[in-house]
Amino acid sequence: MIGSAASDAVDAGQGLPSRPLAQCRPADWRAVDGVMTDVDDTLTRDGAIEPAALQALHALREAGIPVIAITGRPHGWSVPFATDWPLDALVAENGAVALIPDGRGGVATEFAQDEVTRRHNARRLQEVAAQVLREVPGAALAEDSPGRLTD
């Protein structure tokens, strides 16, 4: 947890004091196998990537350190992050989908569940949603579902 903003924080796995990335020496990076980071309000503010965050992602790429970003956003909303940012992968939909940049401006998509399970879950979700809409006055479905591949 080298990148913590709290200078007195400690990495639970190593017992090493953590510090901002900008304060890390090249020798500190030898112990880092990779970086996993949240997207919303960690790399981004108001939906846009912070310039310092993008610079840090590029620095990690140049150092050969893999970076995986993680978000609850739908697959379709996550593709631009996976293709435009220097990432090795992006995990979306709360872990259900991995987007892996193909190096040609596209992404390969891998799922945590097989297709049969995903279809079953989608049918069940539709059944439950229809029941809620029938039985709960004023209920409405969330509007972030377009672009979502799993539920």
Residue ranges and their predicted role:
Residues 19, 145-146:
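Intrinsically disordered, low-complexity segments used for protein-protein interactions
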Residues 46:
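Conserved PLP phosphate-binding loop immediately N-terminal to the Schiff-base lysine helix
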Residues 1-37:
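Non-catalytic pre-domain segments flanking phosphatase-related domains
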Residues 150-151:
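A generic structural motif
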Residues 49-145:
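Active-site phosphate-binding/coordination module
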